[in-house]
């Protein structure tokens, strides 16, 4: 008791071993490392895989200083026809505000000539390999992969194993002096063999995990960008980018290399990652420098690549961090705390056991031969006592506890990668298991994102179905048709490119592609002509404005602006309309109402609606923006985007799992409601609301309304941000949110789990996310939640298993030392038990795949105790049974089983050891299910579990029957083998009895959508 407060495991863990899942501060990371203190066997293995806090701080402080100096042109560059060195080229972009070097080389045109690149056509395909060799590849400095023997070396740094090696060597020396060759080496050599086996198994496990993480890292680096090479626009991997490439940047991209601005529209760059400047910077011909690592927050542009990889400022900084490990997860830190507590208890038990054994030995020696009469055998006995004490520490300090989290996460992440989910941050995988709410986008996530123009409305006429194109051509005047096609072809961010096979391919977003395909199906031959028109100004689409506009110079003089976007927004900008005859007539309120009815009718059929409009001007207003009125409405489009197969079942699975699904979309509210109903998201008592209405609600109104909100339509990115923060602050929800745009970054960052779309998502969104959904599919999101729950549950199973072994092993050896004066479990035997418990146990239990039952229980509440009452019931029940059985064998086993003769002590100790191991084998099966009685269901689907159990039994037979000389065992009779198996198997009956004992749940509040929460574990005073 301290200050009137009771001490508990959870309060201790929360004080010292609690870190946030996202962006943990450096001090929190240092705090838990300090709290672990000396209770760690192998610091290299325990901490080596985590990121170096000091290295991160150093990288943040590092400033790259670039000085103008004399540059020399290497002969290999001259030979290939290049006229500027890589270092000088890299220095130009780093001059930032100083244009001296750029002007000295003749500006961007001079630079392009010196690197043999065309500002229109890019670099030649045949020069790519040469450019990579001379100017560098677009990769950061990478540490070479660690070999298997380096992991062996790490495992050998376990302090307790080192002490055991010393004990073994002393045992061999003393043994040779007393027993001679070869009898004298058996005890010590047995310990050394056991240590080597532990080291090899540990190193193999760590090596396999490292390989899995390397594969995941390679997947993370697969980023595609659009470049122009040899007059062709194509997508290439970011690592294949070379100096001289013409790179196409658009909103949401992360600039992958240093370069110079060629041309573009309203390009705004976030340079905070390098300069710390919070305000976006406008990049233009007057300020042309672009730097790797910066983000495009608005606009689009083409840039000439001038430096790649480690020659960029960003590349140098990233090179200092590369390979420095991963951030630790909250569960790993908490389990380090549990390991520390158990280790402290184990250390006390080890010291007490050694002192009791030593005291009994000295007392016995004093009574019989005197304390001054010492022999080599006496020294050997004390060495063995010390080895047993050290081995108790090996068993008691569960290194495998926090490492099992890494193993389970690595296994889950590898499986998820095959299932099209790339986990960027380890903590996200475990946090997703606690998700109670998913805020999802509609387009591409719930729908297929394969869009087609299904319906068109022009001048009071609706065109529907397969014949709409022919009917439209025959009904609409040539003037209206020409303006419509011109508006589609010039007002687009997509591009038609010809592939190597001669076929046209459209590069761009799905909505743009649908409109462009529609335009090409009407008048494909006009695309090249209209594409040559001079674009005076382009205002790109973003999720705030919900529209895109383009101003062009007409061939016969005059200016025309096209605008397309969200139907209601474009309609508000129009005061005239084109009729089918080609005449422009005023748009009356009645006609506007009719158009709104058309929009709503399209939307109610789950169609995405867009309007396109135009206005003509005599001249472009250079000194002020184009006004948002005076437009002429051309057409309303209804774009079909079918719901993905399986989404409805996935939503139903979420509901059963206590996960509320909310749809957040920029679409019309009628479209949103129709899609939400089709997906099963919008229920009869649910509410669909527009983003503006959400923002107008007071805090009290929002708190009352929030549990019922299922759809937010016409939402802005900050609406999504407000929804996330409100759910977290008002209802303590664990929120997962999807995002694909640059403006989604705040919501992705604020959420507990940010999910970026791999296909439609921008690089800025992906960079802010914790998980990338590679196929943009909602079913994949549900699969991530399923695996997250599996990770959490698997670690709980492993902790339950390991704590049972810890308790029994510690108490058996300590009580035996006190009562009998010897330890029934020798150092070699304890090392074998430690391997079953640590590495093999983790492999068996931490790699259990998810099952359907996991999605029929509520999520774990934020702040819930990790070790639950159910776990304590199972641990204490199994521990008590094992202690009673082993104590019985220890005290009256020889008499009960009529074991006699010179080998009777060794026989009963071997039986105790064998029974103890088989108790763990069967308890490992019990731990597959903490609550369900049927623990065998699906066991053969997990071949790792079955394989490890089989291997454990086989090795146990070998140790007992054939390695007795080293393991201090004797072969057992068939009856004693059967007895060992029966004793172990009874633990399964004990498990059934324990699971029938009701556990008192803590009183908890229910969540707003009505599910009960998992109970907390007991406090230990």
Curated annotation (Swiss-Prot):
<keyword id="KW-0109">Calcium transport</keyword>
<dbReference type="InterPro" id="IPR024750">
    <property type="entry name" value="Ca_ATPase_N_dom"/>
</dbReference>
<keyword id="KW-1133">Transmembrane helix</keyword>
<dbReference type="Pfam" id="PF12515">
    <property type="entry name" value="CaATP_NAI"/>
</dbReference>
<keyword id="KW-0067">ATP-binding</keyword>
<keyword id="KW-0112">Calmodulin-binding</keyword>
<keyword id="KW-0813">Transport</keyword>
<feature type="topological domain" description="Cytoplasmic">
    <location>
        <begin position="995"/>
        <end position="1021"/>
    </location>
</feature>
<dbReference type="InterPro" id="IPR023214">
    <property type="entry name" value="HAD_sf"/>
</dbReference>
<feature type="transmembrane region" description="Helical">
    <location>
        <begin position="807"/>
        <end position="827"/>
    </location>
</feature>
<feature type="transmembrane region" description="Helical">
    <location>
        <begin position="242"/>
        <end position="262"/>
    </location>
</feature>
<feature type="transmembrane region" description="Helical">
    <location>
        <begin position="181"/>
        <end position="201"/>
    </location>
</feature>
<feature type="transmembrane region" description="Helical">
    <location>
        <begin position="943"/>
        <end position="963"/>
    </location>
</feature>
<dbReference type="InterPro" id="IPR006408">
    <property type="entry name" value="P-type_ATPase_IIB"/>
</dbReference>
<dbReference type="GO" id="GO:0005388">
    <property type="term" value="F:P-type calcium transporter activity"/>
</dbReference>
<dbReference type="InterPro" id="IPR008250">
    <property type="entry name" value="ATPase_P-typ_transduc_dom_A_sf"/>
</dbReference>
<dbReference type="InterPro" id="IPR044492">
    <property type="entry name" value="P_typ_ATPase_HD_dom"/>
</dbReference>
<feature type="binding site">
    <location>
        <position position="740"/>
    </location>
    <ligand>
        <name>Mg(2+)</name>
    </ligand>
</feature>
<dbReference type="Pfam" id="PF00702">
    <property type="entry name" value="Hydrolase"/>
</dbReference>
<dbReference type="GO" id="GO:0046872">
    <property type="term" value="F:metal ion binding"/>
</dbReference>
<feature type="topological domain" description="Cytoplasmic">
    <location>
        <begin position="359"/>
        <end position="384"/>
    </location>
</feature>
<keyword id="KW-0597">Phosphoprotein</keyword>
<keyword id="KW-0812">Transmembrane</keyword>
<dbReference type="InterPro" id="IPR023299">
    <property type="entry name" value="ATPase_P-typ_cyto_dom_N"/>
</dbReference>
<dbReference type="GO" id="GO:0043231">
    <property type="term" value="C:intracellular membrane-bounded organelle"/>
</dbReference>
<feature type="topological domain" description="Cytoplasmic">
    <location>
        <begin position="828"/>
        <end position="829"/>
    </location>
</feature>
<dbReference type="InterPro" id="IPR006068">
    <property type="entry name" value="ATPase_P-typ_cation-transptr_C"/>
</dbReference>
<dbReference type="Pfam" id="PF00690">
    <property type="entry name" value="Cation_ATPase_N"/>
</dbReference>
<dbReference type="InterPro" id="IPR004014">
    <property type="entry name" value="ATPase_P-typ_cation-transptr_N"/>
</dbReference>
<protein>
    <recommendedName>
        <fullName>Probable calcium-transporting ATPase 6, plasma membrane-type</fullName>
        <ecNumber>7.2.2.10</ecNumber>
    </recommendedName>
</protein>
<feature type="transmembrane region" description="Helical">
    <location>
        <begin position="156"/>
        <end position="176"/>
    </location>
</feature>
<dbReference type="Pfam" id="PF00689">
    <property type="entry name" value="Cation_ATPase_C"/>
</dbReference>
<dbReference type="GO" id="GO:0005524">
    <property type="term" value="F:ATP binding"/>
</dbReference>
<dbReference type="Pfam" id="PF13246">
    <property type="entry name" value="Cation_ATPase"/>
</dbReference>
<feature type="topological domain" description="Cytoplasmic">
    <location>
        <begin position="202"/>
        <end position="241"/>
    </location>
</feature>
<feature type="transmembrane region" description="Helical">
    <location>
        <begin position="385"/>
        <end position="405"/>
    </location>
</feature>
<dbReference type="GO" id="GO:0016887">
    <property type="term" value="F:ATP hydrolysis activity"/>
</dbReference>
<keyword id="KW-0460">Magnesium</keyword>
<feature type="binding site">
    <location>
        <position position="744"/>
    </location>
    <ligand>
        <name>Mg(2+)</name>
    </ligand>
</feature>
<dbReference type="Pfam" id="PF00122">
    <property type="entry name" value="E1-E2_ATPase"/>
</dbReference>
<keyword id="KW-0406">Ion transport</keyword>
<dbReference type="GO" id="GO:0005886">
    <property type="term" value="C:plasma membrane"/>
</dbReference>
